[in-house]
């Protein structure tokens, strides 16, 4: 994923929230994404772990979700 991609993020609520990637930082353990959400237009950092599906918080929004 890259800057300006439309994504959904897993937060403490049950519904994934839609946002836009503002920045990407790569680390050995995974990738951090700064994502602008409606409530947080300046962005919030989310970390996707490399080796864990449970540690995946940011996902690219699919075409079916865009409809």
Swiss-Prot record:
Q: Which residues form a coiled coil?
A: none
Q: One Pfam family from the UniProt entry?
A: DSRB
The source's domain of life comes to: Bacteria
Q: NCBIfam families under this entry?
A: PRK10708.1
Family statement: Belongs to the DsrB family.
How is this protein named in the record?
Answer: Protein DsrB
Q: Gene name?
A: dsrB
């Amino acid at each position: 994923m890259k800057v300006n991609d439309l994504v959904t993020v897993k937060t403490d609520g049950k519904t994934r929230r839609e946002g836009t990637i503002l920045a990407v930082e790569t680390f050995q353990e995974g990738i951090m994404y700064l994502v602008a959400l409606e409530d947080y237009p300046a962005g919030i950092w989310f970390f996707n772990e490399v080796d864990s599906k449970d540690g995946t918080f940011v996902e690219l929004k699919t075409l079916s979700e865009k409809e």
